[in-house]
Swiss-Prot record:
Signal peptide extent: none
EC number: 2.4.2.17
Compartments in which it is found: Cytoplasm
Matching Gene3D superfamilies: 3.30.70.120, Periplasmic binding protein-like II (3.40.190.10)
A Gene Ontology biological process term: L-histidine biosynthetic process
Family annotation (PANTHER family): ATP PHOSPHORIBOSYLTRANSFERASE (PTHR21403:SF8), ATP PHOSPHORIBOSYLTRANSFERASE ATP-PRTASE (PTHR21403)
InterPro entries: ATP-PRT_HisG_long (IPR020621), ATP_PRibTrfase_cat (IPR013820), ATP_PRibTrfase_CS (IPR018198), ATP_PRibTrfase_HisG (IPR001348), HisG_C (IPR013115), N-reg_PII-like_a/b (IPR011322), N-reg_PII/ATP_PRibTrfase_C (IPR015867)
Organism annotation: Debaryomyces hansenii (strain ATCC 36239 / CBS 767 / BCRC 21394 / JCM 1990 / NBRC 0083 / IGC 2968)
Designated name of the protein: ATP phosphoribosyltransferase
Broad class of where this protein is predominantly found: cytoplasm
GO MF: ATP binding; ATP phosphoribosyltransferase activity; magnesium ion binding
Catalytic activity: 1-(5-phospho-beta-D-ribosyl)-ATP + diphosphate = 5-phospho-alpha-D-ribose 1-diphosphate + ATP
Parts of the chain that traverse the membrane: none
HAMAP family in the cross-refs: HisG_Long (MF_00079)
Amino acid sequence: MDLVNHLPDRLLFAVPKKGRLYEKCCSLLKGVDIQFRRSNRLDIAISTNLPIALIFLPAADIPIFVGEGNCDLGITGLDQIKEADMFNSVEDLLDLQFGSCKLQIQVPAEGEITKPEQLVGKKIVSSFTKLSVDYFKTLENVEDETKLSTSIRYVGGSVEASCALGVADAIVDLVESGETMKAAGLTAIETILQTSAHLISSKKPKFPELVERIHQRFEGLMAAQKYVLCNYNAPRSILSAVLQITPGRRSATISALEKKSDENEEWVAVSSMVEKKKISDIMDDLKKAGASDILVFDIGNCRV
């Protein structure tokens, strides 16, 4: 079925059909209010509230579908985008900051190899052959892949078993916690790429306004997850000091408070977005500076 022509009135949004990115993708789609129901047997889901069709694809295929203009939007790993050699063919809209891992060179922990230069001329296996070839071309200072002295072969699964089975001297694979590699008797000697899930779009989308709308929703959702709203009261005399602590994303919101009859000093109310991971220290610093009535609120969603 030609989905581009079969669904001409809908933006096609490619998302991973399974694997390490799938569950989080579904959660983010809910967060940006793309409502849908997916049948277990179908890899297409029609949004019930937006002119969008979700296309569930292998993560490795998504950069190609988006880069060639078959889909307007996609979510996949940066590693998959670069492995497909499509980074310059798509718009990299946003790092979604999940699915973080490292593409690493791993060697037997009890072996003699401790640095990548020792692998020149040896056997490497990986499911990321392009990125591996690019790395070793740079290492060997050659431009033509055929002139590589290092052998790089493709293995689709259980890459970590390759060294123990005698297939390879080293592997190049994605590593999240490192526990699987450690259990296989491997250790990292080089990180080729730091990767995470990215929101990408076609360079010539069929629905540019809707692409930008969804992009803004994802940006707002990411900001809501990163920031909290900090409200507090402070004497006007210390305003410059407390604003150094809570400058806000662009600037803080300041409102004058009604002066009580028994007060000699004017007070202001301050509202500012601050990074969630820093909030405890920020509250301590505000209290020390002389602020009071310090309150913190979660941000459900926003537009930035």
